[in-house]
């Protein structure tokens, strides 16, 4: 769910039943916090890939008259081929004023295709907007998942990716990212993608829930201004300024 001024917007999702069957939804549901009105919009997509799931979407308030929604990653519902994960070389942009989706090409150090990652963003003092993409996985558990313990930032309006420089060690998926103070993003929970102790297809996913979280209390802080992890939360934080790598991108173009 994302906030659009006085509106809350929920795109896609699932409906299910007691048998465990799920059906993907294609509509955009908007709730107006002022009028208490709920609107179900059917909006045409931007490609023929079909329905997408397990990706991330964030509201960007400082572009367009009503802001924009930026959607990325995840996989394609109903597909089992190796290429069902959606690459980050393109993102989908929704214009709520005109109720239209667009597809936007990106450049830079792109994340590996993944799903069940977390996403959060912040407007900088330089009139850009940076979106953090952290963790997630490609559907496989075990040591092959270690590279997914990585953080990438997409800067807008340049639509340019920058990768944070640290050593991957603790991959996770099914977590959340939350902007909690200017440049600080709070990472909450998730399950251990590294664990795959069972050869049984069903039991192997249970292993991911069995290990202690290396983050104290299941919480961690990522600093967007420095593109690095912080040891603690700072209650009084300076206004968010984009990281030097991002400022360099704009200054050299």
Per-region residue spans from a language model:
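Short Gly/Pro-enriched loop/turn and capping motifs at secondary-structure junctions
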Residues: 138-140, 161, 167-172, 182-185, ...
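Juxtamembrane/interface segments of multi-pass membrane proteins
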Residues: 47-48, 79-84, 103, 107-110, ...
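Short glycine/acidic-enriched loop and turn motifs that connect beta-strands
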Residues: 6-15, 64, 76-80, 126-127, ...
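Beta-propeller blade signature
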Residues: 16-36, 82-100, 145-160, 201-228
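A structural motif specific to WD40 beta-propellers
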Residues: 39-41, 102-104, 162-164, 230
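Extended hydrophobic-aromatic, low-complexity segments
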Residues: 129-131, 141-148, 161-163, 196-197
């Amino acid at each position: 769910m994302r906030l659009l001024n006085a509106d809350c917007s929920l795109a896609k999702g699932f409906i299910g039943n007691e048998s465990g069957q799920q059906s993907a939804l294609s509509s955009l549901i908007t709730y107006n916090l002022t009028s208490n009105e709920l609107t179900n919009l059917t909006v045409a997509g931007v490609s023929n890939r079909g329905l997408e799931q397990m990706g991330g979407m964030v509201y960007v308030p400082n572009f367009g008259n009503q802001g924009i929604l930026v959607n990325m990653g995840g996989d394609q519902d109903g597909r089992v081929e190796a290429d069902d994960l959606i690459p980050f070389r393109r993102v989908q942009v929704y214009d709520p004023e005109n109720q239209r989706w667009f597809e936007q090409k990106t450049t830079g150090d792109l994340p590996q295709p993944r799903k069940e990652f977390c996403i959060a963003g912040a407007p900088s003092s330089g009139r850009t907007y940076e979106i953090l993409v952290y963790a997630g996985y490609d559907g496989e558990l075990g040591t092959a998942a270690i590279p997914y313990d990585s953080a990438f930032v997409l800067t807008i309006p340049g639509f340019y990716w920058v990768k944070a420089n640290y050593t991957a060690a603790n991959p996770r998926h099914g977590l959340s990212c939350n902007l909690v103070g200017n440049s600080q993003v709070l990472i909450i929970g998730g399950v251990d993608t590294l664990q795959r102790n069972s050869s049984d297809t069903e039991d192997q996913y249970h292993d991911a829930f069995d290990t202690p979280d290396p983050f104290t209390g299941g919480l961690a802080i990522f600093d967007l201004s420095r593109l690095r992890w912080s040891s603690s939360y700072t209650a009084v934080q300076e206004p968010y300024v984009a990281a030097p790598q991002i400022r360099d991108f704009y200054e050299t173009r």
